[in-house]
Amino acid sequence: MKIALTERFQSDVRALGAEERAAVFEALLALPRSIGAPHLHAGLGMRKIHRTGIWEARVGLGLRLVFAFADDTLTLVRVGDHDEVRRFLRGL
């Protein structure tokens, strides 16, 4: 599986504190093996959130990871709190 990072995702990660970055990294390690395995992705709270194939996963209590999955490529789109993710989705 390939992993692609958008510029916006990279910018979001740079804006996080050290603890939040570590939590994002842990979620990223779990994400590829959790796709297609409901019993594994339950802990990440993965769910499809947009009809265009955008998904969300929890990173701790306050952060959400937004990604797309197609053609064996996981594209990391955004990371932010619930409100930031909602604003992003309104723009789609």
Annotate each predicted stretch with a short phrase.
Residues 2-3, 47:
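Residues that recognize and position ribonucleotide moieties
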